[in-house]
């Protein structure tokens, strides 16, 4: 009997704890950020949940900066390249490692880039590969981000996601060498050696 009571209590906790998880709206999130309470805390908003971001390792930091600089030079006058800054989506405000967005950059003085401003996003992954390929990919596809690249540092490859169908990317291609073009700028060839840093 005691065991059944304990089981009942645990089941009650499970059901009720699940039901009271708070979902933050974008407006509430902005108020929280503006209040200063999150100052210095490595967190982002994903699907209404405040999620802790992984510390940035040396290889990740170097790759992120190198790739951003390369793309900034390559797309000068064509697109604005942002690194490690927020984007505003529906119920999410993640901080992708690199976002290639529309010009002019001055339009982001009053708001972060929206989905319609984004050409494509890049995540540099080492310890965050599971999160980038299982969690963030859902958010990006559901919000209509047309193209999502993941630089897999551990396996030295680029994983490109395109063609959204039913809130997911239906086309996934892996690259290890050569050149590639974003579907937004088919005339500009990107050297994979510059992304994977061979």
Protein language model features and the residues they cover:
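Gly/Pro/Ser/Thr-rich low-complexity, intrinsically disordered segments predominantly at protein N-termini
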Residues: 1-198
């Amino acid at each position: 009997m005691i065991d059944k009571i304990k089981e009942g209590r645990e089941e009650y906790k499970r059901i009720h704890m699940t039901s009271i998880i708070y979902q933050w709206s974008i407006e509430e999130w902005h108020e929280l950020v503006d209040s200063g309470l999150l100052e210095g805390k490595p967190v982002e908003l994903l699907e209404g949940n405040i999620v802790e971001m992984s510390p940035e390792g040396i290889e990740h930091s170097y790759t992120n900066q190198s790739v951003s600089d390369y793309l900034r030079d390559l797309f000068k006058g064509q697109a604005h390249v942002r690194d490690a800054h927020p984007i505003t989506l529906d119920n999410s405000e993640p901080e992708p490692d690199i976002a290639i967005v529309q010009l002019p950059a001055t339009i982001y003085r009053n708001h972060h880039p929206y989905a319609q401003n984004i050409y494509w996003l890049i995540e540099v992954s080492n310890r965050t590969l599971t999160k980038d390929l299982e969690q963030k990919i859902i958010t990006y596809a559901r919000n209509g981000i047309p193209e999502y690249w993941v630089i897999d540092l551990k396996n030295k490859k680029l994983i490109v996601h395109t063609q959204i169908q039913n809130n997911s990317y239906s086309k996934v291609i892996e690259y290890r060498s050569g050149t590639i073009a974003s579907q937004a700028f088919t005339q500009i060839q990107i050297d994979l050696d510059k992304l994977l840093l061979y």
